[in-house]
């Protein structure tokens, strides 16, 4: 019995917006649905990389086109030595790398105003590609992402938690949606999967963060009601568990900073620091103001201008 046969049930993905579907891992058994809805991109949340690797090799042949699968898996014991996992990781990282480079090529600009020249196709068909982007070049994709674009070219397995998890999830959504828009195939779609679909608090909070990013004037309760209006969420899933998922509140503040305070794509609100490299497991540290670490320079005493003295002048005596 194959992995897909073991997972088989009646779960059908639900639609979040024009290009995003979501559901449980069982959705992968409905290959007819996936093909009919032209699912090209898969984002898996909190699923075993080993499980996804097995499923990938079973479903890949059922698609007439290449699919890209990424996995947000915080398991520190990913069996990368497994041939299936290694093949899954290698092939999808290459595709993701190729996709990002192609989007940069389509944007057509670098620091010198010259088009970026893509490498010959044979360079990236069956191997990792090391792209040399000028460090000071800024593409359209750079402006759309909250994180560092280069981090998404290095792997298709993202071991992140907390706020970094929300950032990686939404940056991947942005990359895939931008690819759909630039590729001219507006029928392509994204499928977001978790173990139990709409009964997973983590998945619901991630979907809410996407709604908030697309609608920054929404508050968190409006986002929750929107997701509830399109998803079948059982009563056992409590609102407070969704709203208080670790990192969700911090990511809401990051959305406001980027999308409202300084406008969409503004560089002012972006974190171009090590926080933009969550793949290397660098957790964002909350910076707290520590008065003991602030060096205070002694300010010079302001000299009083005699012409601006507030003291009442003495009248001259005429003796």
From Swiss-Prot:
Q: Which residues form the signal peptide?
A: none
State if tRNA processing is listed as a keyword.
no
Q: What is this protein called?
A: Uncharacterized protein YOR342C
Q: What else is known?
A: Present with 1360 molecules/cell in log phase SD medium.
Primary subcellular site in the record, as a coarse category: cytoplasm
Cellular component aspect of the GO annotation? cytoplasm; nucleus
Where does the source fall among the domains of life? Answer: Eukaryota
Q: Where is it localised?
A: Cytoplasm; Nucleus
Q: Give the UniProt keywords, A-Z.
A: Cytoplasm, Nucleus
| Segments of this protein annotated with the region Disordered | 281-319
Composition-biased stretches (Polar residues): 299-308
